[in-house]
Amino acid sequence: MAPPPLHLFSPHVPSTSVSPPDPATEAPPAPKQHRGPRPAPRNPGSAKPLTAGVPGGRTRRAVLGIIRKVRSLELSDPRTPSPNGGGGSSSSSTATARVPFHLPIHPPPPEREEEEEKKGIRRAVPWAAARDEETKVVLRREKKTRVPTRAETELEAGELERLRRAARGKERWARAKKAGITDEVVEEVRGQWAKGQELAGVRIVEPLRRCMDRAREILEIKTGGLVVWTRGGIHFVYRGSSYLENAKRHRDFVNYNEELSPVTSNNPTSQGKYWSKDETLTNDNDEADDKDDKPIKGTLYEREVNRLLDSLGPRFIDWWWNTPLPVDADLLPEVVPDFKTPFRQCPPGVRPALADEELTYLRKHARPLPTHFVLGRNTKLQGLAAAILKLWEKSLIAKVAVKVGIQNTNHEQMARNLKRLTGGTVILRNKDYIIIYRGKDFLPGGVAESVIERESQVHDQQAKEEEARLKMADSLQMIVGLSSERSYVGTFREYQDFHDSHARRTTENNFRIQLEAKKHRLEKELKDQEWRLSMLTKKIERSNQVLAKLHSSWSPSKKDGDRELLTEEERRIFRKIGLKMDEHVLLGRRGVFEGVIEEIHQHWKHKEVVKVITKQNQASQITYTSMMLEVETGGTLIAIERFTTSHAIILYRGKNYRRPTKSAPSNLLTKREALQRSIEVQRRGSMKYFAQERKKSIDELKRELRNVTWEIRKLNHDTEQSWTA
């Protein structure tokens, strides 16, 4: 059985009869303009025409490009059908097919085709990739259908375009707060409308700017207007054509709500001030009468989440993410009567602590969950704790978001108080979210009450059995005349005594183990600190040896007894000259060495006064440096002046000054030795400081070790006395 004919160039397609062209009727072809290298001459017996001039050579991409070009040629010049009508004689089926390629393509023998069909082998052909590429279906990502806004549905196109043109020229707008669209922002918007302006702009800031659609809904709910245009982070709100009638109706509605009794408005919410409860939760802005005629919106999961959050408390309308809106924890009661931390009991054989894998799983599980509560206060969270306990009966995790823009919020204190009130486990806490896991030992309210009730019943039954046993023992003693001494073997009292003593011993043993572990840790740390102190001491001794070697390599000059005397007026003049000088000698970390003395003599070559700048802070160091410079240079110290970040030492060369034959003295350190001395002095000072800190920590560890040893001895003494008693 022959394979089906291929559309491109199949050897099984009957060859078409090609008549030679008539040179008289056919126009000469136009000369082709070659761009780039000319292709090699065609040779039917070689494969060079396939790849000549094609980038990529024989790669799959190049072959596919050749096949596309051949197909375009076939479509532009269709073949004439053969006179045999495709019936196909034996000569046409065995002959070489005429194809656009200059390669002889021969059909496979029929025996080979039958064997391949029996074995189910599909032969790969060069044009199969191109054929599959045409039939390949590419599924593009579908764009999210854009939901029209209220302004686009309620306003006419011409009116909407007019309002948007007016909004483009508006230069002033109100600024929302971090807390969202607050009452101040709403009043500012209505104030602009009251002045006769149709549009009022509101700039949205973080975090509400993350979801501008939600910001638009909040603006329309709270102000009663329509957002007609959005530019960047600014919403432009249209007051509406019937603004005066709506404002009058709003005032009447507010007055009516103020006349209501406090019993009917038991739980005031922020959304009740602007919109009804159903309209707020579903973000539906139509009339309430038409609500029953509309189909139910949202999936089953969304409706269940909304139903659960409705049962926990009032919703937070200024939520900066999409629905469902979380519960506003600040509107929950601060104190709940008879509230206490719930009873917990872990199942047998289960450890209450979370493993690392379990913690990672819970954090991943909490990521896609909706936010349940929004909190803005640090204390008085009993109402929130009661709502979390109710939520835990249907969910493993409670997700609490921290309000943005509220002053003095401390998420660490919030998490600590919630953990103390609920007994849960905080698995994540940051400046945005607090996620609390209910724990493995959590029991729902009904189950906890059943466990407590069952335990009380068992205790009462045991007490009744004990009372009956005692009565029976008394009656037997009266009849038989047994001894009046009562035995507690096998009784409930023996169980209670054993349980109390075992619990006490267990507590004492645990406390003793903790003290022993603390003592072992302190001893180990003390030994480590002493070893570190010994190493520091050895390094300090080694540094002292290096410094002693450096100090032995230089010697100070002798002080000249015959010194020039200067009057106060001369000192004042030289001081003024020295302070006005811009040129100076900078004394760095190396201190006084031969290079400094040489530079001072270079200054004195042209000037009588030299100014030396030093960065030293201690007065003793500055005095020692000035005296050393005076002795080594042979000059006269005029003054020591204090600047903002440094000190200036002014030296006068003297009236009988003579330049020395050797400007660099040989009794001082060289530049390299001075740097080595500076580094070693700094290193020794740091080591002395750390050695002092080590000594303080060692003294503190010894004091703690004495206290722990004394507590262990006292505990052992008390245990011995209890055993003897």
Swiss-Prot record:
This is Chloroplastic group IIA intron splicing facilitator CRS1, chloroplastic. Keywords: Chloroplast, Coiled coil, mRNA processing, mRNA splicing, Plastid, Repeat, Ribonucleoprotein, RNA-binding, Transit peptide, Translation regulation. GO terms for biological process: Group II intron splicing; mRNA processing; regulation of translation. Residues 1-121, 259-295 are annotated as: Disordered. Residues 262-273 have a biased composition (Polar residues). The keyword Ribonucleoprotein applies. Required for the splicing of group IIA introns in chloroplasts, by regulating the intron folding. Forms splicing particles with RNA. Also involved in chloroplast protein translation. Residues 10-19 have a biased composition (Low complexity). InterPro entries: CRS1/CFM2/CFM3, RNA-binding_CRM, YhbY-like_sf. Residues 153-250, 352-449, 564-664 form the CRM domain.
